From Swiss-Prot:
Catalyzed chemical reaction(s): a ribonucleoside 5'-phosphate + H2O = a ribonucleoside + phosphate
InterPro entries assigned: SurE, SurE-like_Pase/nucleotidase, SurE-like_sf
MF-aspect GO terms: 3'-nucleotidase activity; 5'-nucleotidase activity; exopolyphosphatase activity; metal ion binding; nucleotide binding
Source organism, top-level taxon: Bacteria
Name assigned to this protein: 5'-nucleotidase SurE
Role description: Nucleotidase that shows phosphatase activity on nucleoside 5'-monophosphates.
Amino acid sequence: MRVLCTNDDGVNAPGLKVIEEIADQLSDDVWIVAPELDQSGVSHSLSLNDPLRLREIGPRLFAVRGTPTDCVIMGSRHVLGDKQPNLVLSGVNKGRNVAEDVVYSGTIAGALEGTILGLPSFALSQEFGGPQNRDKPMWDVARAFGADVIRKVMSVGVPTDTVININFPACAPEEVKGVVVTRQGKRNQGFLRIDGHYDGRGNPYYWIGFEKFPVPDIPGEGTDLAALEGNYVSVTPLRLDRTDMRFSEQLANLFNTP
């Protein structure tokens, strides 16, 4: 089995080394094509107005000056060429990708691009348990559970329009209570803020920021948020087709002619 790995934190991110370790447990044919720079929050953006620069860093290790989506396309269509991967792994992200994160996440987008290309794809993210731990997430949980979760899902097959989103809780491996299949949650949006500043010429500029102590989430039962709060590994199947079928049926009564 040939595995293609990417991420959104960049080619020098520690989580990329963790995804390589996980991939090495699954295959002896692992390739890495990752962004040269941090691409967190770029979602599924595709570089159409700038050229892509590809740099070979080492054996089966490449950096692309582009997004995670660019990396998966470049890896699949150029680096590997006619030796197509059998599996795409994106991560391990520094920080969870749950609830509305799935819309913004470059990590999930990398896996989604693999799904679009017809490849079984997984996004992996490690919760770090609060701002004070942002620079020291506990990667050991991802190391301990990542490969086994992927093997079990692959044993039943991944639907062609589905990406698997895996999130690891912020605890020691021995504190993990199990692995649960979840649905996408919804969080309190009170954590977002705008930080305003002035440059040396008095012109305003802004950063999108996050509250250090936001209003706590009340996770719904069966959600990815609830799983992580309970020290469970969360496995969420996400569909590429985002059509709201129930509302479509209502709209059909308004617009569709007999």
